[in-house]
Curated annotation (Swiss-Prot):
InterPro entries: AAA+_ATPase (IPR003593), ABC_transporter-like_ATP-bd (IPR003439), ABC_transporter-like_CS (IPR017871), ABC_transporter_ATP-bind (IPR050166), P-loop_NTPase (IPR027417). GO terms for cellular component: plasma membrane. Belongs to the ABC transporter superfamily. Aliphatic sulfonates importer (TC 3.A.1.17.2) family. Its EC number is 7.6.2.14. This is Aliphatic sulfonates import ATP-binding protein SsuB. The lineage of its organism: Bacteria, Pseudomonadati, Pseudomonadota, Alphaproteobacteria, Hyphomicrobiales.
């Protein structure tokens, strides 16, 4: 399944784990949409690239529906961890468990680059996210609903080339949401956006997460973004989880509040002290 998807659209959010295939249902159009996220359990996870050991025994449990942000300096292993969870890279050692009855479409990834098909209109780009259900009778209706959820219903017939950067990322989000994933992983999805567009997208991500209840995993360099969105913030340092911060601030959260600023300062202090030790 994973190979076929990559052939038709390389490196998109259409991620699936090879172990999902035995559980795939034959009747696709009648799949019951799950309303809640999947729990995630990781034990002893290791990954190396050549002689470089990037992940060094990660142990982690994420309850169903939780929003987790992962931060750390460049090269610490945070994006590698996300790719292993999504099934985009092979595990060297350890296990990743995602509960029972997991389907390929239950996990989606949104990247920093929207990676839209330039020869397809906006609605068709969103339909790509349906994967094997793209030929179903309700494909157009599902794609239109996803576009409405991200505020771009009026752009359905536009070409990607005429969209702004923020609008392109909204289309990419709609493409990820159209299959109603139970785990949605974000790899620096807002990194290339201007400050105001980024805040708007943060609020959109939080809203769709609260509405749909999927488990969210966000990799970001922006600590303020992490504390604004997440229930937990994990600090990765030299391939291990060095810090696990619970964010108890009430939602919707007030950006720049004393509470969030304090959490941000604590995490930044830890990251800076790690630099001082190296």
């Amino acid at each position: 399944m994973q190979t076929a998807l990559r052939t038709s659209l390389p490196e998109t959010e259409l991620a699936s784990r090879a172990s999902f295939a035995p559980h795939a249902r034959v009747v696709r159009e009648e799949r019951v949409v799950q309303a809640s996220g999947l729990p995630l359990s990781i034990r002893g996870l290791r990954k190396s690239f050549g002689d470089n050991e990037v992940l060094r025994g990660i142990d982690l449990h994420i309850p169903a529906g939780q929003f987790v942000a992962i931060v750390g300096k460049s090269g610490c292993g945070k994006s590698t961890l996300l790719r292993l969870i999504a099934g985009l890279d092979k595990i060297d050692a350890g296990t990743i468990s995602l509960g029972s009855d997991v389907q390929p479409e239950d996990i989606r990834v949104m990247f920093q680059e929207p990676r839209l098909l330039p020869w397809a209109r906006v609605l068709a780009n969103v339909e790509v996210g349906l994967g094997r259900d793209r030929a179903s009778k309700d494909a157009h209706a599902r794609a239109e609903k996803a576009l409405t959820e991200v505020g771009l219903a009026d752009k359905r017939d536009q070409w990607p080339s005429v969209l702004s950067g923020g609008q392109k990322q909204r289309v990419a989000l709609g493409r990820a949401l159209v299959s109603r994933p139970r785990v949605l992983a974000f790899d620096e999805p807002l990194g290339a956006l201007d400050a105001l567009t980024r805040i708007s997208m943060q609020r959109l991500l939080e809203r769709v997460w609260r509405d749909q209840g999927f488990t969210a995993i966000l990799v970001t360099h922006d600590v303020s973004e992490a504390v604004a969105l997440a229930d937990r913030v994990l600090v990765i340092e030299e391939g291990r989880i060095a810090h696990d911060v619970v964010v108890n601030a009430a939602r919707p959260r007030e950006r720049g509040s004393v509470e969030l600023a304090g959490l941000e300062g604590s995490i930044l202090s830890h990251l800076l002290s790690a630099d001082d030790r190296t």
